[in-house]
Amino acid sequence: MRDISYLVSNVDKIENEFINDPGSKAAYNIALYDAFCKSLNISLGSFLGRIIPELPTSITVGIKDINETIEEINEYYSSGFRYIKIKLGDKIDYDIERITKINEKFGSNIKIRIDANQGWSIDDTIKFCNKTTGVELIEQPISVDNTQQLLKLPDSVKEIIALDESLVSYEDAIKYSQNNYGKIFNIKLMKCGGITSGRKISNVALLNDVDLMWGCNDESIISISAALNTALSFPNTKYLDLDGSVDLDKDLVSGGFNLKNGVMKPLDKPGLGVELV
């Protein structure tokens, strides 16, 4: 690898490696951006061109019974979170009942996002949309193998469909945006291979009037900070789902961003703005 000041050539070298290992590619890619920005004593956000100062993130409630779901939402609400992502994808009628009960309890005090975990059919998806209210978006209702079926959804439903597992690469982004499989792309740096790949997908979305959601798995503040700074550099970023470091028992670093009342704001420190603990 060349001197860290040669960011583009170093990134290009990594882009051609780890073809089937996007997590490792993302780790190298993020490290290169962090080191490069630190060499210039600027934040990653400044280098990428942050245009959104801060955004709220959703926080996730897993597949649970209705009482447990409401209890957990209450806890998050008390902590300041107003955007709640509910994991569904079991039985459609029970999924509808859960959301109906949540709406009865919380009304407009929270915004609901759904992750159907590839668990529904096209008919289930349409039924859910017809029977529920107050849902901001639905992640990946259909299995990856049946992604083509999303084209059968009414345009009104496609407006709130977020492609997740189906969206891995730049080529996927071109296909799904030009043919309107859904009007939201959920980008995860560990899924696509890092900041560079994430930006390529984002630019395709921007050119095709597709909104962006930025997600994660259970991850360190390191990669969450990378995703946050990348997200806030695109005007079509509308949704954050970057709660992956919240429940970690222990992290390798601290810093990166402030999280207050569910709103994420990057720290203006060199690189990712993180420090070893």
Per-region residue spans from a language model:
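A generic structural signal for well-ordered alpha-helical segments
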Residues: 36-37, 154, 205, 231
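Catalytic domains of carbohydrate-active enzymes, especially glycoside hydrolases
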Residues: 76-87
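Metal- or metallocofactor-binding catalytic centers and their adjacent structured scaffolds
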Residues: 1-40
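Active-site mouth loops of central-metabolism enzymes
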Residues: 54-68, 117, 121, 162
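Flexible C-terminal active-site loop/helix
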Residues: 217-277
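Catalytic core of soluble alpha/beta enzymes
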Residues: 86, 92-225, 250-252, 259
